[in-house]
């Protein structure tokens, strides 16, 4: 059995599990980033210098010291240089374990979340808990850029094929932000669909939009975690388009009270966590 198979075999994802309602940090499970990065040839050195897995957790509740339930929404940033990514079902089960446990205040819960996620990810993690009153003021955002989805083309390829990007640039030097709402991949373990919007910001020779859209649609039956898909897109664009500067940012729809929004760039900092219409 390969190391890749052994690491994934222990995950709770796709298995019947018991929901525990008293705090238990051991419910968190890690997936080594090395698994996917070995395949991409970037385990030793990544082609991006900025990045995070930006999570929003909508289903967080605990009891105060008088036994009254409290609720909040969390913004979580897991640094791309962390050794592990966090497996999503284990994160959901872990958050559920707060439900019947008492904590002094929101700040204590925030501190515990951050400490536990740092240990699991083995890297930098930022956590901010938001009251519902504060979060309700956050507007629905849009990713800036030109949408490439309305092209009048015929699509027949739904199997992942990076070679669809071959000869994808012309000689015109541009800075562009391109957006597609048609990103869809499948969970590596359960095969459940993952729906996302992706923004590609680059400086370099102009990328052919038809080729780019065909490439993105080819993820439609591809099985990989969200974070891995974004790193694959980044690496493929660097290989075939060879831009001077590149950012890839995907915002995926919510599942189990969590959305995951990976960002990778070689030139710009991590964006604010602003939800889109489908989130």
Swiss-Prot record:
Catalytic activity: 7-aminomethyl-7-carbaguanine + 2 NADP(+) = 7-cyano-7-deazaguanine + 2 NADPH + 3 H(+)
Binding site for NADPH: 88-89, 255-256
Active site (UniProt): 187, 194
Pathway(s) it belongs to: tRNA modification; tRNA-queuosine biosynthesis
Keywords annotated in UniProt: Cytoplasm, NADP, Oxidoreductase, Queuosine biosynthesis
Biological processes, Gene Ontology terms: queuosine biosynthetic process; tRNA modification
Enzyme class label: oxidoreductase
Subcellular location: Cytoplasm
Broad class of where this protein is predominantly found: cytoplasm
Alphabetized Pfam families for the sequence: QueF, QueF_N
EC number: 1.7.1.13
Recorded GO MF terms: preQ1 synthase activity
Secretion signal span: none
Cell membrane recorded as keyword: no
Subunit-structure text: Homodimer.
Similarity section: Belongs to the GTP cyclohydrolase I family. QueF type 2 subfamily.
Xref: NCBIfam families: QueF
Reported function: Catalyzes the NADPH-dependent reduction of 7-cyano-7-deazaguanine (preQ0) to 7-aminomethyl-7-deazaguanine (preQ1).
Protein's UniProt name: NADPH-dependent 7-cyano-7-deazaguanine reductase
High-level lineage: Bacteria, Pseudomonadati, Pseudomonadota, Gammaproteobacteria, Pasteurellales
